[in-house]
Amino acid sequence: MPCVGLIVNDGKELAVETALTLQSRLEQAGIEVVRASSSGGMVGFANPDQHLRLLGYNACVPEGFDASMALAIVLGGDGTVLSAARQTAPVQVPILTINTGHLGFLAEAYLADLDRVIEQVLNKQWTIEERCTLVVSVLRGDQCRWEALSLNEMALHREPLTSMCHFEVAIGRHAPVDISADGVILSTPTGSTAYALSAGGPVITPECPVLQLAPIAPHSLASRALVFSDQEPVTVFPATADRLMMVVDGSAGCYVWPEDRVLIRRSDHPVRFVRLADHEFFQVLRNKLGWGLPHVAKPDRP
């Protein structure tokens, strides 16, 4: 019997109701359904100065999810998709995203498309698009103190009421660079339309094999975002006396202390997105972020 996963944002009533409808219709068609909550992918915030439960990113995989699963349907907003990515990438289960949230930048379908979605799932009418992920590790000496998988970005920044930060960033074999800013963002192409975009970074199309380093509020006219090969590991050394906050995809993170370093590298586990139709990235940019809309001149004031 084919098996399909359901990953649901249990905090959204609409997502829960839709999950019940989907599960009923899939089971009537002879499909086994394994349901999980998206909260399982929300690692939360941890303090490396205290005892840390380091389980590795494989620990987020829900019970019953494995490589034999045909796909997992994700019900929620973009935050739910980021959590689901962390839950499914280690076992390479493809995800079909249905938006029940707000922006839905990562959504493949909407509730109005539900009948079509079910039909295409049952008839196996879909393709797979892979998106790269990152492994983000906090290291102290030879010890890994914290680790998580990231689809969008890692952001390392100062706490409130503290001074501007200084970072030494080593990219692969290249000479380290010094950055003075409120923080730094290391993003994938998928994450280039998220926090990195707000920090002034460029939009990167998903198929480009690159990563992006973007400073947050840099205190320099010459400090700009940098795009480089995703084959290069990145190490960020805090050059500041204050502890810093690190947040990964908005739902995981920890404190980083002056004696720590953050290692970011491309993961061997991409997120596999189910596509029901040709995915036109520039159309998504236009519809969701207003990119390329024609300029309409404002009338002169009387």
Swiss-Prot record:
It is an enzyme of class 2 (transferase). Gene3D superfamilies: Probable inorganic polyphosphate/atp-NAD kinase, domain 1 (3.40.50.10330), Probable inorganic polyphosphate/atp-NAD kinase, domain 2 (2.60.200.30). Involved in the regulation of the intracellular balance of NAD and NADP, and is a key enzyme in the biosynthesis of NADP. Catalyzes specifically the phosphorylation on 2'-hydroxyl of the adenosine moiety of NAD to yield NADP. The keyword Nucleotide-binding applies. The active site is at D78 (proton acceptor). One of its GO terms (molecular function) is ATP binding. It catalyses: NAD(+) + ATP = ADP + NADP(+) + H(+). NAD(+) binds at D78, G79, N152, E153, D182, T193, A194, Y195, A196, L197, S198, A217. The lineage of its organism: Bacteria, Bacillati, Cyanobacteriota, Cyanophyceae, Synechococcales. GO terms for cellular component: cytoplasm. Its cofactor is a divalent metal cation. The keyword Magnesium does not apply. Belongs to the NAD kinase family. Its EC number is 2.7.1.23. Keywords: ATP-binding, Cytoplasm, Kinase, NAD, NADP, Nucleotide-binding, Transferase. GO terms for biological process: NAD metabolic process; NADP biosynthetic process. This is NAD kinase 2. It is found in: Cytoplasm.
